[in-house]
UniProtKB/Swiss-Prot annotation:
GO terms for biological process: base-excision repair, AP site formation via deaminated base removal. It comes from Francisella tularensis subsp. tularensis (strain SCHU S4 / Schu 4). InterPro entries: UDG_fam1, Ura-DNA_Glyclase_AS, Uracil-DNA_glycosylase-like, Uracil-DNA_glycosylase-like_sf. Signal peptide: none annotated. This is Uracil-DNA glycosylase. Excises uracil residues from the DNA which can arise as a result of misincorporation of dUMP residues by DNA polymerase or due to deamination of cytosine. One of its GO terms (cellular component) is cytoplasm. Its EC number is 3.2.2.27. Keywords: Cytoplasm, DNA damage, DNA repair, Hydrolase. The gene is ung. The keyword Cell membrane does not apply. NCBIfam families: PRK05254.1-1, PRK05254.1-2, PRK05254.1-4, PRK05254.1-5, ung. It catalyses: Hydrolyzes single-stranded DNA or mismatched double-stranded DNA and polynucleotides, releasing free uracil. Belongs to the uracil-DNA glycosylase (UDG) superfamily. UNG family.
């Protein structure tokens, strides 16, 4: 099974057509939607299903200009690193001594290694957080999470915050490793995310199960 198989199947369903119709109507009204159309499915472009090792769930895309490009928590180069990603870097630096904090938030090199950076809602209206949360995207991304669980073995799922942790029911914990904590947002990072050791625990598991690991330092 490939992403193309999953996408082809879902695109035939009424809910998916409703999503596309909604986006077309909003654009026709002059509303600005992030990420741009060609970047909406970048998580699937950069992380092939065959190569997928880790899933990190976000909620919805960044809603300011030049930020969102289809990968959860990632921003385009030349843009300030958002606070949640700053805390992700802090946890990496705390738990992995050799980690060098990048001067950007462009996470494509993680994605290419098999870190699937999936927002549960794939679009947002400019400057309106969660504005597209009820248009049907979660039906699609829930299906994606479930397909990963059913068709892969030994994937590490990182579920940060209450929204992501609700997706635990879609994952077979006998086949995969589920790591949970608070969200890396400044509002909650100090209540469990900082100190969670997820990146270390992830690599221990991948080495044990696959003799592979993620090079978290590989952010060119």
């Amino acid at each position: 099974m490939t992403w193309s198989d999953i996408l082809a199947e879902e695109k035939q369903k009424p809910y998916f057509k409703q999503i596309l119709d909604f986006l077309a109507c909003e654009s026709a009204k002059g509303k600005v939607i992030f990420p741009t159309k060609e970047n909406i499915f970048n998580a699937f472009k950069y992380t092939e299903l065959d190569n997928l090792k880790v899933v990190i769930l976000g909620q919805d895309p960044y809603h300011n200009y030049n930020q969102a490009h289809g990968l959860a928590f990632s921003v385009q180069k030349g843009v300030d690193i958002p606070p949640s990603l700053q805390n992700i870097y802090k946890e990496l630096a705390r738990s992995i001594p050799e980690f060098k904090t990048p001067n950007h938030g462009y996470l494509v090199d993680w994605a290419k290694q098999g870190v699937f950076l999936l927002n549960t809602t794939l679009t947002v209206e400019a400057h309106k957080a969660n504005s597209h949360k009820d248009i049907g995207w979660e039906t699609f991304t829930d299906t994606v999470i479930n397909k990963i669980s059913e068709n892969k073995h030994n994937v590490v799922f990182m579920l940060w915050g209450s929204h992501a942790r609700k997706k635990k029911v879609l994952i077979d914990s006998s086949r995969h490793l589920i790591l949970e904590s608070t969200h890396p947002s400044p509002l909650s990072a100090h209540r469990g995310f900082l100190g969670c050791n997820h990146f270390v625990d992830c690599n221990k598991y991948l080495i044990e199960k696959k003799d592979q690991k993620i090079d978290w330092n590989l952010l060119c």
